[in-house]
Curated annotation (Swiss-Prot):
Its EC number is 3.6.1.23. Substrate binds at R63, S64, G65, N76, T80, I81, D82. It catalyses: dUTP + H2O = dUMP + diphosphate + H(+). It comes from Alkaliphilus metalliredigens (strain QYMF). The keyword Thylakoid does not apply. Keywords: Hydrolase, Magnesium, Metal-binding, Nucleotide metabolism. InterPro entries: dUTPase (IPR008181), dUTPase-like (IPR029054), dUTPase-like_sf (IPR036157), dUTPase_trimeric (IPR033704). The gene is dut. This is Deoxyuridine 5'-triphosphate nucleotidohydrolase. Pathway: Pyrimidine metabolism; dUMP biosynthesis; dUMP from dCTP (dUTP route): step 2/2. GO terms for biological process: dUMP biosynthetic process; dUTP catabolic process. It comes from the Bacteria. NCBIfam families: dut, PRK00601.1. It is an enzyme of class 3 (hydrolase).
């Protein structure tokens, strides 16, 4: 198990937490109230900063319940928090619904998943190896 250092920068901040054993994502909590109008976008503050282990990233992902029940999702999903970033963790939410949505203090607004990062060496080549798929993409396998 890895350790993540977390610093509260606001006295309203709640530490991220796993809701259940075996969950991949930790819930992230808002420290503010904010209304997001239909089609609107808002940066939601969490009041925390993190220090990730070497060769990891934090991915900020939507919560399925907010998406299904309120049409609220993370705009740039997954949002990437790089290992060296030391600023406040913010969550960019978008309202795809038809009604305004109110973010409450201490509301669970997103999930944070910690993932390993592989560094690769770039090799420029003239040809790539052949595969069965080749250049098939964008629905090339059909829907049934």
């Amino acid at each position: 198990m890895f350790n993540i250092k977390i610093k509260r920068i606001n006295n309203l901040a709640k530490l991220p937490e796993y809701a259940h054993d075996g969950d991949a994502g930790m819930d992230l909590f808002s420290i503010e109230e904010k209304v997001i109008d239909p089609g609107g976008v808002a940066l939601i503050h969490t009041g925390i900063k993190i220090e990730l282990p070497e060769k990891t990233e934090a991915q900020i992902r939507p919560r399925s319940g907010l998406a299904l029940k309120n049409s609220i999702t993370v705009l740039n999903t997954p949002g990437t928090i790089d290992e060296g970033y030391r600023g406040e963790i913010g969550v960019i939410l978008i309202n795809h619904g038809k009604e305004s949505f109110k973010v409450e203090k201490h509301m669970k607004v997103a999930q944070m998943v910690i993932k390993p990062v592989l560094k690769v060496k770039i090799l420029e080549v003239d040809e790539l190896s052949d595969t069965q798929r080749a250049e098939g993409g964008f629905g090339s396998t059909g829907v049934k």
